[in-house]
Amino acid sequence: MIGKLKGTLEHIFEDYIVLDVHGVGYVVFISNRLRPSLPSVGEALSLFIETHVREEAIRLFGFATRAEQEWFCMLQNVPGVGAKVALAILGTLSPDELAQAIALNDVAMISRAPGVGKKVSERIVGELKSKTLPFEQAVKTVSVPQREITHQPAHDALSALMKLGFEREQAARALALAMNALEGEAVSSALLIRHSLKLLSSPT
């Protein structure tokens, strides 16, 4: 199995590149997020590699960071999510944004990925929420994405908390903890605000 490749970028195509390693050209599939950060053709490039062995072919998937590679593997543990869907998600969301979306039950954010519908997004949230970092640790270690939170009650609650003077990141973390505590209940923006304010007013 190939875990990492370091060589010279030889060609860039729509959804893959050719990486020359000591005269051997490797076809490596990449995400849309990685493409803009690629060096120019002829320059050095190092990628973490996930190898898929199938009866008909061997495919290599390349990632700039270990975190992206780990999320790629984790996503494929969800029923109905294959390599193509996992790569599409990572082409739309960074690992931090994906972790935040799962923490906030933000199905709409995950659904922004091409070919990813609401049912698949809900399955991803349901399957991976308990398999990622412990919740409190996760919301402390991921950065809050600058894009809009699309879960409507959370979005409304976030706007209200920011109007009360709380920083966006501080408010979003409190919201994430509130949503985790209220999981399984009918969540309204008012309920989220009340729980978030309790957390924000508690001594750290």
Curated annotation (Swiss-Prot):
Gene3D superfamilies: 5' to 3' exonuclease, C-terminal subdomain (1.10.150.20), DNA helicase RuvA subunit, C-terminal domain (1.10.8.10), Nucleic acid-binding proteins (2.40.50.140). One of its GO terms (cellular component) is Holliday junction helicase complex. Residues 144-154 are annotated as: Flexible linker. The keyword DNA repair applies. The keyword Cytoplasm applies. SUPFAM superfamilies: DNA helicase RuvA subunit, C-terminal domain, Nucleic acid-binding proteins, RuvA domain 2-like. Residues 154-204 are annotated as: Domain III. It is found in: Cytoplasm. GO terms for molecular function: ATP binding; four-way junction DNA binding; four-way junction helicase activity. Homotetramer. Forms an RuvA(8)-RuvB(12)-Holliday junction (HJ) complex. HJ DNA is sandwiched between 2 RuvA tetramers; dsDNA enters through RuvA and exits via RuvB. An RuvB hexamer assembles on each DNA strand where it exits the tetramer. Each RuvB hexamer is contacted by two RuvA subunits (via domain III) on 2 adjacent RuvB subunits; this complex drives branch migration. In the full resolvosome a probable DNA-RuvA(4)-RuvB(12)-RuvC(2) complex forms which resolves the HJ. Belongs to the RuvA family. This is Holliday junction branch migration complex subunit RuvA. It comes from Bartonella tribocorum (strain CIP 105476 / IBS 506).
